[in-house]
From Swiss-Prot:
Encoding gene, per UniProt annotation: trpA
GO molecular function, one term: tryptophan synthase activity
Catalytic reaction annotation: (1S,2R)-1-C-(indol-3-yl)glycerol 3-phosphate + L-serine = D-glyceraldehyde 3-phosphate + L-tryptophan + H2O
Function, in words: The alpha subunit is responsible for the aldol cleavage of indoleglycerol phosphate to indole and glyceraldehyde 3-phosphate.
Pathway assignment: Amino-acid biosynthesis; L-tryptophan biosynthesis; L-tryptophan from chorismate: step 5/5
Annotated active site: E49 (proton acceptor), D60 (proton acceptor)
Organism in which the protein naturally occurs: Pseudomonas aeruginosa (strain LESB58)
Residue ranges that the Swiss-Prot or TrEMBL entry lists as coiled coil: none
Record's protein name: Tryptophan synthase alpha chain
InterPro entries, per the entry: Aldolase_TIM, RibuloseP-bd_barrel, Trp_synthase_alpha_AS, Trp_synthase_suA
EC number: 4.2.1.20
HAMAP family: Trp_synth_alpha (MF_00131)
GO cellular component terms listed in the entry, alphabetical order: cytosol
Family, as annotated: Belongs to the TrpA family.
Lineage: Bacteria, Pseudomonadati, Pseudomonadota, Gammaproteobacteria, Pseudomonadales
Length: 268
């Protein structure tokens, strides 16, 4: 079993959802970003999504766009992001880590090289937001052949006819974007989330993670009662943007992660 399968199976036994945290590699700088990454499991993150900075993150809202700019201004590259995972893995072998981003940097790096190095440094899966299933052979199939999970995004506008196509070849978990729009947008109603989870469960046995718009422990707990995973990104990244310095940013992100984890763990 993959690290993702193992983690979700273990949490199912515990009858609770996973807290899935998203941060951007290299934000606010390499050292602070690595410190955040290393601190997330102890703060309560069950799965980590690590953003690969890109100059044109079109699916992301202002918070993550600014995080991309901060990281790129600090010299973050895809090679440095893979190195960051290697350093994280030197002390943490159980928490699943998924790289999330866009196809362009991977394409420029070289797909075969990227997959080989991602596997070697301890990446567990990929979320590539601008690569539809019609392009599975570009990355999804070779990644899975190498033992990396490929996690698909579904949205409120993904209809029942389209869902089987989107889910075909998905592995790890399904990431349901509960609001059609950019990351960090307003949250969906819980009724909408409940209906969406029920609809997805008719099409897949994979765990379902819900993201976009979750900002507080209370909201995380409410979503954790309905889904297998609660994904939080913009709220954590806002803490970095608002911190007076990088040391404070590390503390504030890990503190919020702890609050969210408590909400998720006490939800059911």
């Amino acid at each position: 079993m993959s690290r993702l399968q193992t983690r979700f199976a273990q949490l199912k036994q515990e009858n609770r959802a996973a807290l899935v945290t998203f941060v951007t590699a290299g934000d606010p700088d390499y050292a602070s970003s690595l410190e955040i990454l290393k601190g997330l499991p102890a703060a309560g993150a069950d799965v980590i999504e690590l953003g690969m900075p890109f100059t044109d993150p079109m699916a992301d809202g202002p918070a993550i766009q600014l995080a991309n700019i901060r990281a790129l201004d600090g010299g973050q590259t895809l090679a440095r992001t893979l190195q960051m995972v290697r350093e994280f893995r030197s002390g943490e072998s159980e928490t699943p880590l998924v790289l999330m981003g866009y196809f362009n940097p991977i394409h420029h790096y070289g797909v075969e090289r990227f997959i080989a190095e991602a596997k070697e440094v301890g990446v567990d899966g990929l979320i590539v937001v601008d690569l539809p299933p019609e392009h599975n052979e570009d990355l999804c199939h070779p990644a899975q052949a190498a033992g990396l999970d490929f996690i698909r995004l579904t949205t409120p506008t993904t209809g029942d006819q389209r869902l089987p196509t989107v889910l075909e070849g998905s592995s790890g978990f399904v990431y349901y974007v509960s609001v059609a729009g950019v990351t960090g947008a307003n949250a969906a109603t819980l009724e909408h989330v409940e209906e969406a989870v029920a609809r997805l469960r008719r099409h897949t046995d994979l765990p379902i993670g819900i993201g976009f718009g979750i900002r507080s422990a209370e909201h995380a707990a409410a979503v954790a009662r309905l889904a297998d995973g609660v994904v939080v990104g913009s709220a954590l990244i806002d803490r970095i943007a608002k911190a007076r310095d990088n040391a404070q940013a590390v503390k504030d992100v890990l503190a919020l992660c702890g609050e969210l984890a408590e909400g998720v763990r006490n939800a059911r």
